[in-house]
Amino acid sequence: MAAIDVRNLSVGYGQNVLLQNLNFSVNEGEIFVILGGSGCGKSSLLKNLFGLYEPLAGNVLIEGQDITDAHGEDRQKIMTHFGVMYQQGALFGSMNLLENVTLFMEEYTTLDREQMNLLARCKLDLVGLLPYEQYMPSEISGGMQKRAAIARAMALDPKILFLDEPSAGLDPITSADLDRTILDLSQNLGITFVIVSHELASIYSIANRVIMLDKASKGIIAEGDPKVLRDQSPDPRVHQFFNRIMSKEVP
């Protein structure tokens, strides 16, 4: 069974259709990256996949359960299957790292405070931040904040993590450290990652498979191993995209 199955999905706002009739799946344990130029609907697609936005049409199945038709308790159960890290990380500045990680445990679990703290420390340890549990977000680096946000996204032991531009704003060395964290979590815990990114080094080093979205056609123009697509795709739009990434000129 696929971790995520997307069927005839159309994404947009009101009469503004960004993407239409998308069909693809994400395998369990896979690092799956969504590519495309600015304005093509990458982040909007991601938010449709985890249910923040409702699609214009079509369905998204997570672990075989249709999130687009789920409501109430059924929807809450599905939501415990995944975690989300937004582009800015969005840690709460008035809480230390331990408190940030336990935040959603308070709402979605029946654990007592001691149990929540123990579980949160395990998550911080997985991303190399256990010694910093009492630090405030403002007291740690941007890369550490991103790793803390991933720890918080793992608070409910999800099988899937959705990450929106996790390397945004990071220097190459810090970005590579974050990539290693993602790879470790995928390989050691079997977590499925769905990532929006345009960082070429990250894409090549961690992605098992990518899809490339196109603004003009409102669809998927390529799918597969990113290096194979770069070297062998017959579609000139694919080569143009990779060339623009290399020159940091993604439109």
Tell me what each language-model feature is.
Residues 136-140, 144:
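Conserved ABC ATPase signature
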Residues 58-66:
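Conserved ABC transporter NBD signature motif
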Residues 216-241:
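Conserved beta-strand-loop-alpha-helix hinge in the C-terminal portion
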Residues 50:
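Helix-to-loop junction immediately C-terminal to a conserved catalytic motif
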Residues 155-159:
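A short, proline-enriched helix->beta-strand linker immediately N-terminal to the Walker B motif
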Residues 113-131:
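Conserved ABC ATPase "signature" region
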Residues 161-164:
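Catalytic Walker B motif of ABC-type/P-loop ATPase nucleotide-binding domains
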